[in-house]
């Protein structure tokens, strides 16, 4: 019997540690500003359970080389899936850095980013003691009809409804914008910081009016 897999959820990942040092340095001011914006909240409730988000990074030239790299890789990611990218212009809709609270509790509940074609993560500060991304089964029909898995299964199998990746500094992950994802609760043992981005593929006839 032939085993065929159709309609896969494609996730790319690689290790690119060469960006870590410069992007951590460039990110420090953004995380500092994000914490200052939350100063009153921290004073009242403490530094627990928070995720400190930066302002947009799309126009900061300290991130230019990285932005060009992930922009090209995101284009290649779509092209690899068979899309006719000669008809589309890829545009960053969002690019930001964030850091979880030092005293722990930082997390993201499961979500998607509306009207995006490519999403991605690049990890700047993390370890086996920090949070990590969790991805969920994107097919509604499959989620509705899941069965109980065998108790001794190891690894990721087609029947699983979610899986996680354990990154290290320099890990880059690219995935479809429709893929639901979340971040496990961080315990505040070691710093956790990462860059997140979203990209839209806009028809060139439309893109020429906005670029």
Please name every model-derived segment.
Residues 52, 133, 183:
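Short clusters of hydrophobic/aromatic residues that line enzyme substrate/ligand-binding pockets
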Residues 1-88:
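Non-heme Fe(II)/2-oxoglutarate
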Residues 17, 123-125, 198-202:
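Solvent-exposed residues in well-ordered beta-strands and their adjoining turns
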Residues 154-211:
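Catalytic core of Fe(II)/2-oxoglutarate
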Residues 59-91, 101-117, 124-128, 207:
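Active-site region of the double-stranded beta-helix
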Residues 7-11, 117, 192-194:
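Short hydrophobic/aromatic beta-strand or adjacent loop that forms the aromatic wall/cage
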Residues 95-97, 120-122, 195-199:
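A structural signal for short, well-ordered beta-strand segments
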């Amino acid at each position: 019997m032939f085993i065929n897999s159709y309609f896969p959820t494609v996730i790319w990942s690689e290790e690119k540690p060469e960006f870590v040092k410069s992007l951590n340095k460039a990110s420090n001011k953004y995380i500092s500003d994000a914490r200052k914006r939350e100063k009153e909240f921290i004073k009242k409730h403490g530094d627990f359970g928070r995720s400190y988000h930066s302002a947009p990074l799309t126009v900061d030239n300290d991130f230019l080389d990285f932005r060009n790299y992930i922009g090209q890789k995101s284009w290649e990611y779509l092209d690899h899936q068979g899309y006719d990218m000669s008809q589309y212009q890829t545009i960053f809709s969002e690019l930001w850095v964030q850091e979880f609270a030092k005293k722990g509790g930082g997390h993201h509940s499961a979500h998607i980013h509306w009207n995006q074609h490519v999403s991605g993560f690049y990890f700047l500060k993390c370890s086996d003691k920090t949070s990590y991304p969790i991805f969920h089964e994107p097919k509604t029909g499959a989620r509705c009809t899941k069965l109980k898995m065998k108790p001794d299964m190891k690894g990721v199998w087609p029947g699983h409804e979610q899986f996680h990746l354990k990154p290290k500094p320099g890990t880059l992950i690219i995935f479809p914008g429709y893929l639901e994802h979340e971040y496990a609760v961080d315990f505040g043992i070691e710093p956790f910081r990462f860059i997140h981005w979203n990209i839209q593929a806009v028809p060139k006839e439309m893109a020429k009016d906005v670029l």
